[in-house]
């Protein structure tokens, strides 16, 4: 019968070997995660906030008019979505 200590040692050695093989294959593709993260978190010029003539959602509407689709809240002076109870 197989000894429990030997069985545990073989299992541990197998896991270490599996880790080494996976690490070796990943080291070849080491740049891939960096490229993926940089492409996800890259700031695109299209998504940067632009200075507009109108105020967007939840922006102050004291000096600027609200953009189309929003109305200026008389209570808070923010641009909000129009609703029947906000007339």
Curated annotation (Swiss-Prot):
Q: List the disulfide bonds.
A: 54-67, 61-72, 66-79
Cellular localisation: Secreted
Using the record, list the residue span of the signal peptide; answer none if the entry has no such feature: 1-24
| Propeptide feature ranges | 25-52
Q: What are the protein's GO molecular function terms?
A: ion channel inhibitor activity; toxin activity
- Indicate where this protein is primarily found: secreted
Question: Record's InterPro entries?
Answer: Huwentoxin-1 (IPR011696), Huwentoxin_CS1 (IPR013140)
Q: Sorted alphabetically, which Pfam families does this protein's record hold?
A: Toxin_12
Q: Which UniProt keywords apply?
A: Disulfide bond, Ion channel impairing toxin, Knottin, Secreted, Signal, Toxin
Task: Describe tissue expression.
Answer: Expressed by the venom gland.
Gene Ontology CC terms, in alphabetical order: extracellular region
**Keyword Nucleotide-binding found:** no
Q: What does this protein do?
A: Ion channel inhibitor.
Q: What is known of its domains?
A: The presence of a 'disulfide through disulfide knot' structurally defines this protein as a knottin.
Protein family according to the UniProt entry: Belongs to the neurotoxin 10 (Hwtx-1) family. 51 (Hntx-8) subfamily. Hntx-8 sub-subfamily.
Q: What is this protein called?
A: U3-theraphotoxin-Hhn1a 18
The opening ranks of the lineage are: Eukaryota, Metazoa, Ecdysozoa, Arthropoda, Chelicerata
């Amino acid at each position: 019968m197989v000894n429990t200590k030997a069985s545990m040692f073989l299992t541990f050695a197998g896991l270490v070997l599996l880790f080494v093989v996976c690490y070796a294959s990943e080291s070849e593709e080491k740049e891939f995660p960096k490229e993926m993260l940089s492409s996800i978190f890259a700031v695109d010029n299209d998504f940067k906030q632009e200075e507009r003539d109108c105020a967007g959602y939840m922006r102050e509407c004291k000096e600027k008019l609200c953009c189309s689709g929003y109305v200026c809240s008389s209570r808070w002076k923010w641009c909000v979505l129009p609703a029947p109870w906000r007339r």
